Amino acid sequence: MLFLQFLFVDVVLGGSITENVVQENISLYLMQISSYANQSWTQNLGSAWLDQLQTHSWDSESGTIIFLHAWSRGNFSNEEVTDMQLLLRVHFAELTLDVHQQASQLQFKYPFDIQVRLGCELHSRETTKSFLHVAFNGLNFLSFQHKSCVPSPEGETRAQKACDILNTYEATKEIAYYVMNDICPRLLLSLLEAGKMDLQRQVRPEVWLSSSPNLEPGRLLLACHVSGFYPKPIWVMWMRGAQEQLETKQGDILPHADGTWYLRVTLNVVAEEAAGLSCRVRHSSLRDQDIILYWGHGLSVILIALAVIVPLVLLIVLVLLCKKRCTYQGIP
């Protein structure tokens, strides 16, 4: 099969390693999703991700790479990008033909999808962990270990047949190994250097609480809103003292137009038991200073403020009235 050549072309972007990059526990992975509806219709999607941040996508209509950030090119020249896009177009054409030809032998029944995930994780400048996994219709199908194709138990006999074929393709295995253990780590470091200002950006979240009546009588749906934070990873939990409330439900992390994120976390509680609950937020921008908001705390502050301000206003009014009365009494 030729589909592994996609992985080679997608990461051979050129460029050198920047020596002053130091980044740990971050991964770069490439995704390919190829959908085969029948013998005459195929769609290929491609993307690249730096941890949870998408850096590239593939426009199958125009046959071009979409760079999603100003730094997504790394240190690659326009000529290198042009050459890579041409190679990708050729690859997808050959990939489609090759898979269709092998479909009968591998017992692939239309329609079907093939997903490929290749990447590397950087632990230090000297240590990386690489991987290449292939799925068929969303189930583990095969993987590459060192320079060999290894079938997944879920892939059954079809995966074994595919590996039997791939293991005879010495050039394909060499390409896969080279991409995982050489090109991927170098590309990862290049992106980290080119995008370090954006990747190292830290924006503190804003947090507020709200509630709404529940469909069940006597219950409240408490909501903890966390907005405007960056980067994306965050931990939010409703708490009672030091105890996490396991019924906490987290919604999807949604993007803002400025690149920051929003999250809503809810808890369904009996109204009388809402007192004493708090929402705790942990984020890299906060360092070790978690944000903790207590339910009902805002109301308590208002009551305290009213308890202080109202008597003060009454005292001022009383003083003014006394002065006014004294003034009238002094008039003959």
UniProtKB/Swiss-Prot annotation:
Residue ranges occupied by any Ig-like domain in the UniProt entry: 205-292
The record's annotation in InterPro entries points to:
Ig-like_dom (IPR007110), Ig-like_dom_sf (IPR036179), Ig-like_fold (IPR013783), Ig_C1-set (IPR003597), MHC_class-I_related (IPR050208), MHC_I-like_Ag-recog (IPR011161), MHC_I-like_Ag-recog_sf (IPR037055), MHC_I/II-like_Ag-recog (IPR011162)
Positions on the Extracellular side per record topology = 18-300
Instruction: Spell out the PROSITE patterns in the cross-references.
Output: IG_LIKE
Q: How does it sit in the membrane?
A: Single-pass type I membrane protein
Q: Name one GO biological process term.
A: positive regulation of T cell mediated cytotoxicity
Extra information: During protein synthesis and maturation, CD1 family members bind endogenous lipids that are replaced by lipid or glycolipid antigens when the proteins are internalized and pass through endosomes or lysosomes, before trafficking back to the cell surface.
* Name of the protein in question: T-cell surface glycoprotein CD1c2
Show the taxonomic lineage.
Eukaryota, Metazoa, Chordata, Craniata, Vertebrata
Gene that this sequence comes from: CD1C2
